[in-house]
Amino acid sequence: MSTEQVGAEITSIEELKSYIGKETSVGDWFLITQEMVNKFADATGDHQFIHVDPERAKQTFFGGTIAHGFFTLSATGMFSRDASGVRVRLAGSKMGVNYGLDRVRFISPVPVGKRVRVRRKLIGVEEAPDKRWVQMKNETTVEVEGNDRPAMIAETLTRAYF
């Protein structure tokens, strides 16, 4: 990411479109704890041992507990809350919402006790015919510190409503 992007604020749709194909943010490293994974397991009912039983998980090829793939996906907002990069604040926008996901892949595990971060690259911008919303498509990548392969890659869709 170029230094001129860091801290920039996008206020117009035309300016937003100029970022298509560019990395727009990189989050700070974020530690994944067993407590977080356990709370996610409790919230979802997914208590598979590879997530919640450190002793048993040590016996697997993972070598310990790992975060749920859906925890990794759902926590991307938390992982990127202190991200450096551009901020999208379109003039007149009343709210932003998650609209959906395309092409989600969990490529490698997220071991408990490791740090992760999120990278986002804007890959598309679509305007509603009636100008009620603007949709942004980002390539969202979760990286595990020290790993060459990402943990997750997804195309995330968000909308700004006017």
PLM regions with names:
Residues 1-19, 108-162:
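HotDog/MaoC-like acyl-thioester-processing domains
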Residues 2-98:
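Hot-dog-fold acyl-thioester-processing enzymes
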